[in-house]
Amino acid sequence: MTAALSSEISLHPLLDNLPSSASTTTKQEEPSLPALPITLICHCPPSSSPGPIKVTLTNQILHNHACGCSKCWKPSGALFSVVGVVPSSGLSVIANAEKLEVVDENATIQRWKCKECGVHLYGRIEKQHPFRGLDFVHGELALGQSGGSEGEGENEGGGLGEGKVEFAAFVSSIIEGGFEPHAHANGDEGKGGNIKQVRDRLREIFGEKVYDCLSPSLMDVIAEWEGRRSGKLKAVL
C-alpha cells in the first residue's frame, strides 16, 4: 500500500484540502456561479505603479481542470495549475495591457503574462487548431479569490465558472517539471517522492478522471477536428 501524499506537497491551493470523492461529503461543493463579468487580476499590488493588469470575462469559465503540463502558470510551490476556457470574443484586457508579454511565441497556446509578477492572464491560440476561439484562463485570479487583490470585493469566491475542478490532466508531465517520481530509500525525496502517491490523491478527489492527456471528451473533439481536416471524416455542412 502506498503511503499518503506528504502534506508538504501541494497539488494546488484549490485542491489540497478537498475531501475524497468517495467520502459521504462526496464531491467538491458546487459554489454558485460568479456574477458576470468576471474580473481576473495579476498579482501586482494595487498600490504599485501603474497597478495590476485586469482582464474581464463575459462568459463563465468551462472545463476547469488541474493541469500538470510544464507550460501552464502555477501558484508558487504547486504541482498543478487550475485552468479552464472561455470564448475569446468574451475576453478583454481593461487595465495595463502594456505590461503583458507572450511567454513563448513558438508555442501553440500564446500565453500572455505580466512582465512584473509573472502571472499568466490568458492563453490564446492564433493558428488553426480545434480549440481556436477559446482562451485559457485561471479562475483563481478573479477578484475575491486568493490570487486577487485584497479589498476589492467583486466576484467573491473566485471565478471558477462551472463551480468546480472537473478532472486532472497531463499528470505525468509534473515529472518533466522536476517532480521526483520515485520514493528514495534514504527518505530524502527532494521536490517529489512518489508519482503513485500523487495519482492516488488525485483519484481520491476526481475518481477515475485522472489522465495523462486531456479528458476523453476533449480528446474526441481534437480527433474529430483532425479527421475532418484530413478528409478522413466527412465535412460537416
From Swiss-Prot:
Binds 2 Zn(2+) ions per subunit. Residues 38-152 form the CENP-V/GFA domain. GO terms for molecular function: metal ion binding; S-(hydroxymethyl)glutathione synthase activity. Zn(2+) 1 binds at residues 42, 44, 114, 117. It comes from the Eukaryota. Its cofactor is Zn(2+). It is an enzyme of class 4 (lyase). Keywords: Lyase, Metal-binding, Zinc. It catalyses: S-(hydroxymethyl)glutathione = glutathione + formaldehyde. The keyword Membrane does not apply. Its EC number is 4.4.1.22. PROSITE patterns: CENP_V_GFA. Pathway: One-carbon metabolism; formaldehyde degradation; formate from formaldehyde (glutathione route): step 1/3. InterPro entries: CENP-V/GFA, Mss4-like_sf. One of its GO terms (biological process) is formaldehyde catabolic process. SUPFAM superfamilies: Mss4-like. Zn(2+) 2 binds at residues 67, 69, 72. The keyword Protein biosynthesis does not apply. Belongs to the Gfa family. Catalyzes the condensation of formaldehyde and glutathione to S-hydroxymethylglutathione. This is Putative glutathione-dependent formaldehyde-activating enzyme. It comes from Sordaria macrospora (strain ATCC MYA-333 / DSM 997 / K(L3346) / K-hell). The lineage of its organism: Eukaryota, Fungi, Dikarya, Ascomycota, Pezizomycotina.
